Amino acid sequence: MIRKAFVMQVNADAHEEYQRRHNPIWPELEAVLKSHGAHHYAIYLDQERNLLFATVEIESEERWNAVASTDVCQRWWKHMRDVMPANPDNSPASAELKEVFYLQ
């Protein structure tokens, strides 16, 4: 498995709405993530700084990257763009983090 971590932001007035939209996520989005090899996907909120910290384990970079081109992912991004900063293609503005320590 490949471990990934990344950060995003959520609008200061949208913490509750962001959480509501994820509980639960759309079943078809969950199915796409799982079918593309995503496991143990978690998102944490730093309420003071409006930061989201996400971790996920993936089976391959290619399969993970392919999620972005699915119809359900495109619809999800559009659904979320009003509660968080987004790129021109509606994907969440994010930065991948480099792993510097791991204890198994």
Curated annotation (Swiss-Prot):
Pathway: Carbohydrate metabolism; L-rhamnose metabolism. The active site is at H22. It is an enzyme of class 5 (isomerase). Gene3D superfamilies: 3.30.70.100. Its EC number is 5.1.3.32. It catalyses: alpha-L-rhamnose = beta-L-rhamnose. It is found in: Cytoplasm. It comes from the Bacteria. One of its GO terms (biological process) is rhamnose catabolic process. GO terms for cellular component: cytoplasm. Belongs to the rhamnose mutarotase family. This is L-rhamnose mutarotase. It comes from Salmonella newport (strain SL254). The gene is rhaM.
